[in-house]
Regions:
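Extended, charge-enriched "interface" segments that sit outside catalytic cores
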Residues: 29-106, 381-383, 394-397, 404-410, ...
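Active-site phosphate/pyrophosphate-binding segments
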Residues: 190-344, 377-486, 497
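Conserved, well-ordered active-site substructure
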Residues: 496-529
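Glycine-rich phosphate-binding loops that contact phosphosugars or nucleotide phosphates
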Residues: 101-270, 344, 348-372
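Conserved, mostly hydrophobic/aromatic
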Residues: 8
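Structural motif
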Residues: 299-301, 348-352, 459-464, 515-518, ...
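C-terminal amphipathic alpha-helical interaction region
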Residues: 25-32, 404, 409, 424, ...
């Protein structure tokens, strides 16, 4: 009886605290603002929200009740150990002085290079593109590729004697990241700084990993031990996102305060239909069950790259057991007539943005459109949490575990086998591929296999350049406009840590276009019998094997030794194939 009274008192006090904070936000104009036009889908969403409220979903989320996602007792502890992101903003606010000191001490560097993949790199990349670097703070570079030309490009941009390298990996064992470390450690020592090489390095990892041990042995200047109960894609508001952000001068305290604001708006005492995170999750989950599983992001130019992070969060969390939500990031906005009935649009705008006529046209045409408005860039803190909650709730609606990634390891294992073959034979195994100049029939055959709800995934194991970006945009637009097929695009191996799980574990509606190029430059990996070029090629072959073993429709196109000409040929082939 006493326990019951204490429980009621605690819940009542939480409710009063939330009401107090919510009323204060209303008076000050703070708090999440969302508008939506769901047309004929509104009743279904309302019913889903009512069901979530009846199931006590908001309270169970914050109580870390694993049965919200799985009834399997074996998964109970595993899921609970992945929900630390719910309270990490408040936890990190206790370290504000640490971030201030880091921002001050980091001014001694001209550049910071973040070495990481997936959840360790995407939030820093968003912050880099959104905020740039404050005057007096170093410039941030994010390296999440094994492409030799890109690695050499970063090396050429920095003064290595004035650079800090952040080695970021939750597991401490990420192949790409450790390869990056080996290369830059060697570069530092080559430049005569062997005695103080460790002063140019910091590590972000879970406690007790092999990376923590390596960092201690090499005398790293900083070692940040992240809370271990947070999965990589949910780690934006932890050290993985905040350390790089603080170094470039982002106001970390205010960004965390915005996240706490959102946490109060999404509190366990806030009903599902008034709860911004639960509401968005209900929309995504319910519409996905009705075939509208392409969450198409349209972002204000001021936060144009926020979708990089959202893409991984949604794809890796929901793409499993043959189910999943396909995030469409970076696809140019088209006229209403080019879209099918498999979309839901989320428009992320900024206060002061002019009306978006393309979005208005989509609403008028009856497409479901959700509009989320940010006050300024620091509202990203709240948006990180809103989308994490929404994705977790969407997972509950789809009845899948939103916190595992059962198929990610598959391509990694295949890559290891390919590398083992290279070590023993001195060459990579062959793969069926077609030159870009002769790819029309293969691409036409691939697109003709598209069923209702299909999407084209462009997987480019190439150097990212303005030319490649323009070519990919042209391919996406042509396919979308002529075939009414949604498109995604990613650079390898980066996308393997993002949408790779969805490709293999999600709905079998994907059409896969793998694009590779011949590397004219290469970089050795110290301590390994293979180079970055060989590693990148092995990763593309490993993923190709994974696709083929699942009998997924895939075409591999080679750009040759002149990527610019190869891209032009590929764009022409696609435009011809969709006529």
């Amino acid at each position: 009886e006493v326990e019951g009274v204490e429980s009621f008192t605690k819940s009542f006090e939480s409710l009063l605290d939330t009401l107090k904070k919510e009323s204060a936000k209303i008076r000050t104009g703070k708090g999440p603002r969302q508008w939506y036009s769901l047309a004929t889908l509104q009743p279904a969403v309302d019913a889903r929200l009512a069901a979530l409220q009846k199931d006590d979903a908001p309270r169970r989320l914050w109580a870390k009740d694993s049965t919200l996602w799985s009834s399997d007792p074996a998964k109970r502890d595993e899921i609970r150990d992945r929900l630390g992101w719910l309270s990490v903003a408040e936890q990190m606010l206790e370290h504000v002085q640490e971030f201030r000191d880091l921002a001050r001490d980091g001014r001694t560097y001209s550049d910071v290079v973040l070495l990481g993949m997936g959840g360790s790199s995407l939030c820093p990349d968003v912050l880099r593109n959104t905020f740039g670097s404050t005057k007096g703070h170093p410039k941030l570079h994010v390296l999440d590729t094994t492409d030799p030309a890109t690695i050499l490009g970063v090396r050429a941009k920095i003064r290595i004697q004035d650079t800090l390298f952040i080695v970021a990996s939750k597991s401490g064992e990420t192949t790409e990241t450790l390869s990056h470390f080996a290369y830059f450690w060697n570069e530092i020592n080559k430049n005569g700084r062997s005695g103080a090489a460790g002063r140019h390095f910091a590590a972000i990892t879970d406690p007790g990993t092999s990376l923590e041990k390596l960092a201690k042995e090499h005398g790293f200047r900083w070692i940040f031990r992240n809370p271990p109960d947070i999965g990589g894609r949910y780690s934006a508001l932890s050290y993985f996102g905040l350390v790089p952000g603080s170094l470039i001068g982002v106001n970390i305290e205010e960004m965390l305060e915005r996240a706490v604001e959102m946490a109060h708006s999404c509190a366990d005492s806030v009903p599902a239909d008034k709860n911004p995170g639960v509401w968005l999750g209900a929309v995504m989950g319910e519409l996905a069950t009705r075939g509208r599983n392409k969450v198409t992001l349209i972002a204000s130019p001021k936060v144009a790259t926020f979708g990089y992070w959202v893409e991984q969060l949604i794809a890796e969390s929901t793409g499993k057991q043959g189910k999943g939500i396909v995030p469409i990031e970076g696809e140019p906005v088209g006229k209403p007539a080019v879209y099918g009935d498999d979309r839901v649009f989320v428009y992320i705008r900024m206060d002061g943005d002019a009306p978006n006529r393309a979005v208005q046209a989509l609403e008028k045409a009856g497409q479901p459109v959700v509009t989320l408005t940010m006050r300024d860039k620091l509202d990203l803190g709240g948006e990180f949490l809103r989308w994490e909650i929404a994705t977790a709730i969407a997972g509950a609606v789809l009845r899948i575990d939103a916190f595992d990634q059962p198929n990610v390891q598959e391509s990694k294992d295949n890559t290891k086998k390919v590398l083992a073959s290279f070590k023993s034979r001195g060459k990579l195994p062959p793969a069926d591929s077609v030159p870009a100049s002769r790819s029309k029939s293969g691409i036409k055959g691939l697109l003709d296999r598209g069923k209702d709800g299909a999407y084209l995934a462009i997987m480019a194991y190439t150097t990212r350049t303005p030319g490649s970006e323009a070519a990919i945009e042209a391919i996406r637009t042509s396919v979308r406009d002529r075939k009414h097929i949604a498109t995604t695009a990613g650079y390898g191996p980066r996308f393997l840590h993002s949408t790779g799980q969805l490709h293999k574990g999600g709905p079998r509606t994907g059409l896969f276009l793998q694009i590779v190029q011949d590397d004219t430059k290469d970089v050795s990996i110290p301590g390994q019998p293979y180079s970055f070029s060989i590693l990148k090629q092995a990763q593309s072959l490993g993923d190709l094997q994974s696709m083929s073993s699942r009998r997924l429709p895939v075409v591999r196109v080679t750009l040759g030794r002149d990527p610019a000409a190869g891209w032009r040929s590929l764009v022409a082939a696609v435009k011809s194939a969709v006529k």
